[in-house]
């Protein structure tokens, strides 16, 4: 089966193009993903961002630090919980959001060229199911447990 290889190729190609196209706004190496989620989820904390994007906390911490140093996001102490820092896009970060969404919309339209609306919806539903299946294993491994490959 080569389904995950195909998904990986598509994801890497889209990410590579986005990274090139976002260079002129000083976004590098997937930082646009973090900025979009922070704009869409004002007050999100890093752990929630990690879960949302399915990346480890240290990767989130590095990207958040870079976005903050560029003035695109800011951290604020959460009300009643000084340990958690809520993340918010600055006005500068919010101004990039429509541009990033335009790239996303264009890429999705290109990727789905030749698909009927029904086929596109079916693909979205199937990929959501794949994501949920992977999420279960991701949660398991994230907690230090091992997956069982015994019946593969």
Pin down the residues of each PLM region.
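Residues within helix-turn-helix
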Residues: 46-47, 58, 65, 85
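Pre-recognition alpha-helix immediately N-terminal to the DNA-recognition helix
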Residues: 13, 17, 33-36, 95, ...
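Short, locally clustered residues in the helix-turn-helix/winged-helix DNA-binding domain
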Residues: 8, 36-40, 101
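Short capping segments at the starts of secondary-structure elements
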Residues: 41-45
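C-terminal regulatory/oligomerization modules of transcriptional regulators
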Residues: 117-152
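The alpha-helix within a helix-turn-helix
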Residues: 50
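N-terminal leader segment of winged-helix/HTH proteins
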Residues: 1-25, 141, 152
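Charged, amphipathic alpha-helical coiled-coil/dimerization segments
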Residues: 65-128
């Amino acid at each position: 089966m080569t389904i995950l290889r195909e998904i990986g190729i598509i994801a890497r190609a889209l990410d590579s193009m986005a990274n090139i196209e976002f260079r002129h706004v000083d976004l590098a190496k997937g930082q646009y993903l973090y900025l979009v989620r922070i704009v869409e989820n004002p007050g999100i904390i890093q752990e929630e961002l990690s879960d949302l994007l399915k990346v480890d906390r240290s990767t989130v911490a590095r990207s958040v630090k870079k976005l903050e140093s560029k003035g695109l996001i800011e951290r604020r102490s959460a009300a009643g919980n000084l340990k958690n820092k809520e993340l918010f896009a600055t006005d500068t970060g919010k101004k990039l959001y429509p541009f990033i969404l335009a790239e996303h919309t264009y890429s999705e339209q290109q990727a789905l060229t030749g698909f009927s609306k029904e086929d596109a919806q079916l693909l979205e539903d199937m990929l959501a199911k794949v994501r949920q299946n992977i999420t279960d294993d991701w949660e398991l491994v994230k907690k230090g447990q091992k997956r069982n490959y015994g019946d593969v």
